[in-house]
């Protein structure tokens, strides 16, 4: 099977609804073996909001295959914190997440960051380890919407 061509670009305001739906599909599919139904419901029950739309518009990067949005990710270039890395379930395992992580790491290096960090969902930690991240301790991610989820804080030193 031929590997699909993945293109990356900065998100636009019009991409926000698609990014929101992709996020929810990725969570419900990818996290279903590591989180309870109640946790998944809390995680995905929020409404599409102006705040999310603004975050996508100003911070998200998108991965596309054949002009279809199949992945998201963002990095805070002041803190090195990576967030919102989500991949469409039907293309998981086809290099989309890896390509997004390389892109975000390139941005971090260009900004002069010494390290990058993220809070990995329990199911995603093995993937991030393959990308050079370290961390094994389970912690709690505190959602701004008032609930918490187990996660694994991870860090990667950039050389």
Where are these regions (language model features)?
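Conserved G/P- and acidic residue-centered "switch" motifs that form tight phosphate/ATP-binding loops
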Residues: 95-97
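Conserved GNAT acetyl-CoA-binding A-motif
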Residues: 108-121
